[in-house]
Amino acid sequence: VTGAAGLDAALAAIAAGRMAVIAGDRLRGGDIDLMIAAEAVTPEAINFMATHGRGLICLSVTPERAAQLGLTLVNPGTERQTGRPFARSIEAAHGVSTGISAADRAHTVRVAIAPGASNADIHSPGHVFPLIAQSGGVLTRASACEASIDLARLAGAGDAAVICSIMRDDGEMARLEDIGDLIAAHGLAVAEIGELIARLERADA
């Protein structure tokens, strides 16, 4: 299910702490991502992304959260073209072992989004890759980073999200038509960025 119904289903899933698919990233040639609200992240969710997404697992944060953590863009000026506004990779300062396990990465996410978190709570480099979103969300930049935060907010699930690009079995980036079996097997709802933009524009009108 796509379109408005898909967006509604995705918002319901996110509100319930489940995963959804983001489609239609305009800055990355239509790449698609798995997404879960950061406040709902678990080791099982990280493992699902690593197993079925196979791309880089990233933490989408607002500029305000990034500033709170002392994070800045690694390569300012390129993020508008790439749709991947990377800050330096992070690890929780305490409570992890090697940092790369699903449990360790989930812990790092929880530490980074805690209300009182600061730069003292994280170390770099690490195994979680923060993305710093544009303040205006998808109305400013139509990428999965901004979409994931907008979706979390609309779902009442905070203002941070974990996303992971989906690769095909042959290593190429997947398109929506490539993951029908994955969507069906796991009951994943699809939020299209174009539909999200249209809804937010109507809300602003």
Model regions: which residues?
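Catalytic domains of riboflavin
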Residues: 1-205
